[in-house]
């Protein structure tokens, strides 16, 4: 009916005229297409704009810069003004003319501003694409870095840098505090001097360079940013293409080196007397690629067990998921309460375990396998695993079985559980069980039990010998083709850490502990500089030897004064700790007693002070001394797989002082130069500062002109004077109020040592 009516209307010429000639004036339609700045039909708009003769508007100045007609005689701009603005209407041909004949600007800033793009092109040019393989891709969503070549500034820090570089004259408080902010700002201001590129563009590009951008993407394979930038080229739903990046980027190197540094530091801290204090000391004194590790930790979102322990120690928030057996567990539903329970192993050993009572579901994500676990109190209900290979799947199954705390798992233990950590402390029961079955899980799998399975799409069974099956499977366990996504949330929670580096959330659940730190060794991409003496041994005995002597030489001025006035404090310095492991156990105490007696004689008899000898023997005096009459002409240190000798008097391959160059070499490596001349006879005595006198500080004119060493003997006890010592330095000294004999001094030293130990 309606269509017929419409046809009738259309047959009248007036209707046709109204529809084609008159303007549309229905308010609703006008509103729809004109409200807001957003173009409602961009494709149509583009089409009809380009059909016009002058679709572009330009600044008035363009008339002076462009001819009215081009070489072909086509008009480039119209004399009529743009309605509603004072701009002129221009033809698309004007753009062509401008591109061919317009003024050129310097191209020098382009590679600097578009640095990330230029670098990407280079990486792709030098990258190698291998063959395409067709196979099922187990992809799991992980949070990945999608922006290679960035610094690690927070959004706020980057904003301040960008404002300072691009809009330096804009009003607004900008606080550039961190070292990286200041360095980047200075560098960019220099690079972008006289830059003609639109400031907004520069700002966008700077943001790409300064801020880490992450996305939650399905990935099978490499997760570093140089792989993610070619994700669309390297993996599809059923295919993958091999690819080797044509270059590395600093942000990936920082992530990789940070993990290695954190692992080394946590491992080292675990074996020291106060793990937490040691860990903090090492984090604060370590640099990675020339940047302080603590600064990197504050900015870098990498989640790895050791890195998170370091962050927790610094009071930073970390992810609320917890780690067990190298898998990251995230509870997705359910809840539990913890109760201590005693259980008996198959070997009738009693274990005290904290049992989780209640139904819970977890996702487990590891490097090479992922799983979904549903469990009740001491019972595994269901485990769905997926992984790269049989080995990886087995690892995940073992961890889940141990985590389930099932009785048949505990009964599968054969032999005693006595695993210890690096500090020789027994591991907690859950980690005891884990280590036991990681070594050999045969009995565990045999005793677990098997069940017939239903045919479910995408799932198959797995037998106790880890072979796949469509008929039977380990009780509750299935293998899936699909991976389990990593936990996507980036929420961070406040945690606490105890002195043994166990990290807990606010409910007291343990999220991390040193047992969870991987033992994998890698080679860092960026130089890691550990200034802490605790890390000297990381490169072996030789490095300990060289570092110890370098430390003494670097700090000789203060060491020298302590040597003469408060030797006990000097001997207790932690810098001498690593050295003790090089001295044969049986000889440590004897060497120490011998060297301390020798030093005491040097302090007592003027003129026998010998800088080189003190430096050489000092590390040996740090061990608790044994009082014996033993004399030694050489002391043994264990390096290069055997005992090497340090001569008490004279040079040796281990310790060689060159008088001519005043340089010390240890095992052929340069250990530094001695600033003072050790052979000036009494000058040496002066610089050791005489026994019976206390150095009070710098010269004080109130106490008259500087005396020579010989004039000192006239001072009364408690009297102060300025003295001229070795290098023409003048210091203020005071004669001690009581004469301390050798005997009392050595006795108090020994007593103090005993107390300190």
Swiss-Prot record:
It is found in: Virion; Host nucleus. It comes from the Viruses. Transmembrane segments: none annotated. Pfam families: Flu_PB2_1st, Flu_PB2_2nd, Flu_PB2_3rd, Flu_PB2_4th, Flu_PB2_5th, Flu_PB2_6th, Flu_PB2_7th. A motif (Nuclear localization signal) lies at residues 735-738. GO terms for biological process: 7-methylguanosine mRNA capping; cap snatching; DNA-templated transcription; symbiont-mediated suppression of host gene expression; symbiont-mediated suppression of host mRNA transcription via inhibition of RNA polymerase II activity; viral RNA genome replication. GO terms for molecular function: RNA binding. Its main location: virion. Plays an essential role in transcription initiation and cap-stealing mechanism, in which cellular capped pre-mRNAs are used to generate primers for viral transcription. Recognizes and binds the 7-methylguanosine-containing cap of the target pre-RNA which is subsequently cleaved after 10-13 nucleotides by the viral protein PA. Plays a role in the initiation of the viral genome replication and modulates the activity of the ribonucleoprotein (RNP) complex. HAMAP family: INV_PB2. Belongs to the influenza viruses PB2 family. This is Polymerase basic protein 2. It comes from Influenza A virus (strain A/Silky Chicken/Hong Kong/YU100/2002 H5N1 genotype X3).
């Amino acid at each position: 009916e309606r269509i017929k009516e419409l046809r009738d209307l259309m047959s009248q010429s007036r209707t046709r005229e109204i529809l084609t000639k008159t303007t549309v004036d229905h308010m609703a339609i006008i509103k729809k297409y004109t409200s807001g700045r957003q173009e409602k039909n961009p494709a149509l708009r583009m089409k009809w704009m380009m059909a016009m003769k002058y679709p572009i508007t330009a600044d008035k100045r363009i008339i002076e810069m462009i001819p009215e007609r081009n070489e072909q005689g086509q008009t480039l701009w119209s004399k009529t003004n743009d309605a509603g603005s004072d701009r002129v209407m221009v033809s698309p041909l004007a753009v062509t003319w401008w591109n061919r004949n317009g003024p050129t600007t310097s191209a020098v800033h382009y590679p600097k501003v578009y640095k990330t793009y230029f670098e990407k092109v280079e990486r792709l040019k030098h990258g190698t694409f291998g063959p395409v393989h067709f196979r099922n891709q187990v992809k799991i969503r992980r949070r990945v870095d999608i922006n290679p070549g960035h610094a690690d500034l927070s959004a706020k820090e980057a904003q301040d840098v960008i404002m300072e570089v691009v809009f330096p004259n804009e009003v607004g408080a900008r606080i550039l505090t961190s070292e990286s902010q200041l360095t980047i700002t200075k560098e960019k201001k220099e690079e972008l001097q006289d830059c003609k590129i639109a400031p907004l563009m520069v700002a966008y590009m700077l943001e790409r360079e300064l801020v880490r951008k992450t996305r939650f993407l399905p990935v099978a394979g490499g997760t570093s940013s140089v792989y993610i930038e070619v994700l669309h080229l390297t993996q599809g739903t059923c295919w993958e293409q091999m690819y080797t990046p044509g270059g590395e980027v600093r942000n990936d190197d920082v992530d990789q080196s940070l993990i290695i540094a954190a692992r080394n530091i946590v491992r080292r801290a675990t074996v020291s007397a106060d793990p937490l204090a040691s860990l903090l000391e090492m984090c604060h004194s370590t640099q990675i690629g020339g940047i302080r590790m603590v600064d990197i930790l504050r900015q870098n979102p990498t989640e790895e067990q050791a890195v998170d322990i370091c962050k927790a120690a610094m009071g930073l928030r970390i992810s609320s998921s917890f780690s067990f057996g190298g898998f990251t567990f995230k509870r997705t539903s359910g809840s539990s309460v913890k109760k201590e329970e005693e259980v008996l192993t198959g070997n009738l050993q009693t274990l005290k375990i904290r049992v989780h009572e209640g139904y819970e579901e977890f996702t487990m994500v590891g490097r090479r396998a992922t799983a979904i676990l549903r469990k009740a109190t001491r019972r595994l209900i269901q485990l769905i695993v997926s992984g790269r290979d049989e080995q990886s799947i087995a690892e995940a199954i073992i961890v889940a079985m141990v985590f389930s705390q099932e009785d048949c798992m505990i009964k599968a233990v054969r032999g005693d559980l006595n695993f210890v950590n690096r500090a020789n402390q027994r591991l907690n029961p859950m980690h005891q069980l884990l280590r036991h079955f990681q070594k050999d899980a045969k009995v565990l799998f045999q005793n677990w039990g098997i069940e017939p399975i239903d045919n479910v799409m995408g799932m198959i069974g797995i037998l106790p010998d880890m072979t796949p099956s469509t008929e039977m499977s380990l009780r509750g366990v299935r293998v899936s083709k699909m991976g389990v996504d990593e936990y996507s949330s980036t929420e961070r929670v406040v945690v606490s850490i105890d002195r043994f580096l166990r990290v807990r959330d606010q409910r007291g659940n343990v999220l991390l502990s040193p047992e969870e730190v991987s033992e994998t060794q890698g080679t860092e991409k960026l130089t890691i500089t550990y200034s802490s003496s605790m890390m000297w041994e990381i490169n072996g005995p030789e490095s300990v030897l060289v570092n110890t002597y370098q430390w003494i030489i670097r700090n000789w001025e203060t060491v020298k004064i302590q040597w003469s006035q408060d030797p006990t404090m000097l001997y207790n310095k932690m810098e001498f700790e690593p050295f003790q492991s090089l001295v044969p156990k049986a000889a440590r105490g004897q060497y120490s007693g011998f060297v301390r007696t020798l030093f005491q004689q040097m302090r007592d008899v003027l003129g026998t002070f010998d800088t080189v000898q003190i430096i050489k023997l000092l590390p040996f005096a740090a061990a608790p001394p044994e009082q014996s009459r033993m004399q030694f002409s050489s002391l043994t240190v264990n390096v290069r797989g055997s005992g090497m000798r340090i001569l008490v008097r004279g040079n040796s391959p281990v310790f060689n002082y060159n008088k001519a160059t005043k340089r010390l070499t240890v095992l052929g490596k340069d250990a530094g130069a001695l600033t003072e001349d050790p052979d000036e006879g009494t000058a040496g005595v002066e610089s050791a500062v005489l026994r019976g006198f206390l150095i009070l500080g710098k010269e004080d004119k109130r106490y008259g002109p500087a005396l020579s060493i010989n004039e000192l003997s006239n001072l009364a006890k408690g009297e102060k004077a300025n003295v001229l010592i070795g290098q023409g330095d003048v210091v203020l000294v005071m004669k001690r109020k009581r004469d301390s004999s050798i005997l009392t001094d050595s006795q108090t030293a020994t007593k103090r040592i005993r107390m300190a130990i």
